């Protein structure tokens, strides 16, 4: 097998006690994606021969959530990082190299790993850091010539060793030809009673194998997550990076510190996004789209020149050009709006196609419907689409005028240019051009006197 064969082992077996969560630590999300999923994506971008993910705590939940084409290996006992890599040995090539990554180090990037792999060659590669606070981290020990000789975990470190600022990130490149022998010779005679992967550095030095350290260019790239505070810190770093990329690409963000993208955002020119907006899944924004404050948009395509007013929620929907949406509007899955549509405050649309120029400006529910062009919904219109068992469709033609406080009881069809009187409950089809009234006739009672309270 060629010497440049690359295997990747991702360690993801830890419980994450300090997360105080029933969810396995590696499933907590950064940018809307499980941390482990992010690490697998980065690993896959290196085109390795295979990727082995070592799981343990919450194995079934991890496999159910992160559905990837990788080799899943179970570590039944959590006996340390060295033991975890050892469980993956049967799936690693006899030759080549193994890169060790971690499922709770979500921001490691391809550029950093390529630099490490290039520096390591066929020797040992070690990614190091000089963090602001090295507390709790393993220290990099060097000799008088500056060569790395060992990694000492803080619990096993002397006072002098604890004074060292350079720390171990845990990310290693190891030659497969030596890996099995090194792992088999590990001892658990340490403060943790575990098999440390870091002890392989001293073994490499003992065998005359050069250790080539590479310092990570930014600490957050190799930062691990052990608690919710660290998770939140990395989330904000990640979101800041995404905001900066969008700003460089010409998107106006009124407050980059209050912007969240949990997916991918494709955009045209002169897009404006106000504060506190959340974008999830696949988003496409056309030219001159404006998104008001505190909107939540998930898996949506929004056409050019459309304005989304504050506090609107859009999910799994498609919006045409020159639309006016909100404030406080809700577009639910399968809402499909043509061009020049107006959807106002407290209007909800679900599984409905809305034709060009149609308006529903106030307090309206449109569900399971097909609506033509230039139709107007009066305030308080409700499409009653559910009979308690089944959903039914409503068809509304072009240039229909629906009076305020009407109920359209599906299944029902209103032809073109139909008008319905305010307060009507429409239960039968209405032909083109007709006026439909379905309400009780008003009665005025002559001589009626309103009761008064007893003044005594």
UniProtKB/Swiss-Prot annotation:
Species per Swiss-Prot/TrEMBL record: Neisseria meningitidis serogroup C (strain 053442)
Record-listed E.C. numbers: 2.7.7.23, 2.3.1.157
Enzyme class per UniProt: transferase
Record note on quaternary structure: Homotrimer.
Binding annotation for Mg(2+): 104, 226
Cellular localization per UniProt: Cytoplasm
Cofactor annotation: Mg(2+)
Protein name per UniProt: Bifunctional protein GlmU
Principal location listed in the UniProt entry: cytoplasm
Record's GO cellular component terms: cytoplasm; membrane
Protein residues bound to acetyl-CoA: 379, 385-386, 404, 422, 439
Positions that bind UDP-N-acetyl-alpha-D-glucosamine: 11-14, 25, 75, 80-81, 102-104, 138, 153, 168, 226, 332, 350, 365, 376
Keywords linked to the UniProt accession: Acyltransferase, Cell shape, Cell wall biogenesis/degradation, Cytoplasm, Magnesium, Metal-binding, Multifunctional enzyme, Nucleotidyltransferase, Peptidoglycan synthesis, Repeat, Transferase
Catalytic activities: alpha-D-glucosamine 1-phosphate + acetyl-CoA = N-acetyl-alpha-D-glucosamine 1-phosphate + CoA + H(+); N-acetyl-alpha-D-glucosamine 1-phosphate + UTP + H(+) = UDP-N-acetyl-alpha-D-glucosamine + diphosphate
Cofactor stoichiometry and binding remark: Binds 1 Mg(2+) ion per subunit.
Primary role: Catalyzes the last two sequential reactions in the de novo biosynthetic pathway for UDP-N-acetylglucosamine (UDP-GlcNAc). The C-terminal domain catalyzes the transfer of acetyl group from acetyl coenzyme A to glucosamine-1-phosphate (GlcN-1-P) to produce N-acetylglucosamine-1-phosphate (GlcNAc-1-P), which is converted into UDP-GlcNAc by the transfer of uridine 5-monophosphate (from uridine 5-triphosphate), a reaction catalyzed by the N-terminal domain.
Pathway, per record: Nucleotide-sugar biosynthesis; UDP-N-acetyl-alpha-D-glucosamine biosynthesis; N-acetyl-alpha-D-glucosamine 1-phosphate from alpha-D-glucosamine 6-phosphate (route II): step 2/2; Nucleotide-sugar biosynthesis; UDP-N-acetyl-alpha-D-glucosamine biosynthesis; UDP-N-acetyl-alpha-D-glucosamine from N-acetyl-alpha-D-glucosamine 1-phosphate: step 1/1; Bacterial outer membrane biogenesis; LPS lipid A biosynthesis
One MF term in the entry's GO annotations: UDP-N-acetylglucosamine diphosphorylase activity
Pfam families for this protein: Hexapep (PF00132), NTP_transf_3 (PF12804)
SUPFAM superfamilies: Nucleotide-diphospho-sugar transferases (SSF53448), Trimeric LpxA-like enzymes (SSF51161)
């Amino acid at each position: 097998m060629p010497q440049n064969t690359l295997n990747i082992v991702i360690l993801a077996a830890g419980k994450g006690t300090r997360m105080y969560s029933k969810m396995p630590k590696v499933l907590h999300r950064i940018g809307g994606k499980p941390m482990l999923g992010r690490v697998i994506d980065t690993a896959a971008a290196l085109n390795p021969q295979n990727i082995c993910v070592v799981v343990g705590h919450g194995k079934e939940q991890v496999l159910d959530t992160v559905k990837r084409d990788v080799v899943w290996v179970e570590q039944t006992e959590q006996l340390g990082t060295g033991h975890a890599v050892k469980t993956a040995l049967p799936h690693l090539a006899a030759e080549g190299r193994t890169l060790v990554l971690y499922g709770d180090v979500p921001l490691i990037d391809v550029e950093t790993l390529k630099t490490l792999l290039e520096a390591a060659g066929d020797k040992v590669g070690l990614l190091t850091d000089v963090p602001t606070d090295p507390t709790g981290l393993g220290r990099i020990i060097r000799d008088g010539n500056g060569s790395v000789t060992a990694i000492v975990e803080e619990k096993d470190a002397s006072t002098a060793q604890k004074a060292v600022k350079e720390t171990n990130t845990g990310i290693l490149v190891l030659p497969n030809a030596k890996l099995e022998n090194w792992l088999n010779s590990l001892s658990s005679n340490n403060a943790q009673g575990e098999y440390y992967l870091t002890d392989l550095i001293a073994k490499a030095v003992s065998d005359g194998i050069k250790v080539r350290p590479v310092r990570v260019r930014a600490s957050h790239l190799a930062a691990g997550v052990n608690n919710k505070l660290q998770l939140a810190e990395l989330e904000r770093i990640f979101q800041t990076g995404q905001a900066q990329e969008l700003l460089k690409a010409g998107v106006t963000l009124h407050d980059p510190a209050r912007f969240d993208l949990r997916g991918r955002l494709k955009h045209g020119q002169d897009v404006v996004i106000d504060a506190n907006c959340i974008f999830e899944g696949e988003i496409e924004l056309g030219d001159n789209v404006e998104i008001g404050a505190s909107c939540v948009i998930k898996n949506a395509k929004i056409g050019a020149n459309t304005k989304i007013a504050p506090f609107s929620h859009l999910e799994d929907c498609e919006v045409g050009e020159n639309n006016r949406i909100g404030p406080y509007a809700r577009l639910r899955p399968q809402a499909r709006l043509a061009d020049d549509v107006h959807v106002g405050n407290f209007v909800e649309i679900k599984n409905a196609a809305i034709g060009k120029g149609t308006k529903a400006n106030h307090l309206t529910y449109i569900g399971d419907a097909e609506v033509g062009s230039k139709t107007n919904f009066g305030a308080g219109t409700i499409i009653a689409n559910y009979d308690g068992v089944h959903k039914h469709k409503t068809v509304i033609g072009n240039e229909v005028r629906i009076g305020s406080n009407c109920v359209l009881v599906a299944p029902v069809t209103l032809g073109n240019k139909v008008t319905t009187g305010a307060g009507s409950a429409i239960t039968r089809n209405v032909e083109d051009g007709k006026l439909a009234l379905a309400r009780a006739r008003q009665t005025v009672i002559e001589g009626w006197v309103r009761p008064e309270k007893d003044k005594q």
